[in-house]
């Protein structure tokens, strides 16, 4: 049984999307139980429409919700201990839930998660990992916005955490890792990126296979299982990819409806276009994972549909079922154990 806590008030649509999304996820994963936090007058009428979900859920009333434009510092002051966002995170801290899923304000969610759960031992800064559709299937890209200007040691930490996530999500024994750079040559790039490459190579990590530098187009190609970068460039890459997907979709709709002949052609190629539309559908890969915390936190897009929110729950389910937190902790322990100088006669 996987226990998932939900911030019902998060996102642009709150319980009107989160609850139907939970119902869809429950159909796929009958072994889920939900712990829900939200405003009773908005949530109870919607929850009452889903009998199976109601049976598998415990509802806790919260009168405070965090708005999508609220500053993290303000959200912490106003919502700590009492908001639906805080209490859903706290359920993980208290061991009542295995994972929390929220579509709420990203900055506020990260601030509350860091304050409530704290970062893991030997992790300076957390990262947000995104699941990225590629020509080969899917890959993981991190960081996509949590840590701007990460240094070389933090990038190595991201590689360790991303590798653990790939093993949990894709069930790959030794995932390939690449550092995002302006070229694949060793001499190119910022000093922190070059130093991170050296650190990862010299660490000779058993849990991952370092493939060197990768460029922006390698992300979509699926050249490696995990692409590591700092939060500024990662967030730009993510937003650019999402914008490009929407642009291609708009181009296709325009081209296929412009003339009668185009409409007829579309009918013959409908199967292929439906497959392309599914590949470009952001709801299929919704759910950013906060890595480096003492608990699993999943961030859904704020404007997600019910189907997209269900996809975010799917990610949380997989991460909890496959022991993401334990995998990260074990990899970090192995790495730092190798770094410890020998003690006693061996040190002589």
Curated annotation (Swiss-Prot):
Localisation per UniProt entry: Cytoplasm
Pfam families to which the protein is assigned, alphabetical: FA_synthesis
Protein source organism: Rhizobium rhizogenes (strain K84 / ATCC BAA-868)
Subunit structure: Homodimer. Probably interacts with PlsY.
One GO BP annotation of this record: phospholipid biosynthetic process
Membership in a protein family: Belongs to the PlsX family.
One of the record's GO cellular component terms: cytoplasm
HAMAP family reported for this sequence: PlsX
Substrates-to-products reaction catalysed: a fatty acyl-[ACP] + phosphate = an acyl phosphate + holo-[ACP]
GO MF annotation terms: phosphate:acyl-[acyl carrier protein] acyltransferase activity
Protein name as annotated: Phosphate acyltransferase
Purpose: Catalyzes the reversible formation of acyl-phosphate (acyl-PO(4)) from acyl-[acyl-carrier-protein] (acyl-ACP). This enzyme utilizes acyl-ACP as fatty acyl donor, but not acyl-CoA.
EC code(s) of this entry: 2.3.1.274
Lineage: superkingdom: Bacteria
Protein's pathway: Lipid metabolism; phospholipid metabolism
Swiss-Prot/TrEMBL keywords: Cytoplasm, Lipid biosynthesis, Lipid metabolism, Phospholipid biosynthesis, Phospholipid metabolism, Transferase
Family annotation (InterPro entries): FA_synthesis (IPR003664), Phospholipid_synth_PlsX-like (IPR012281)
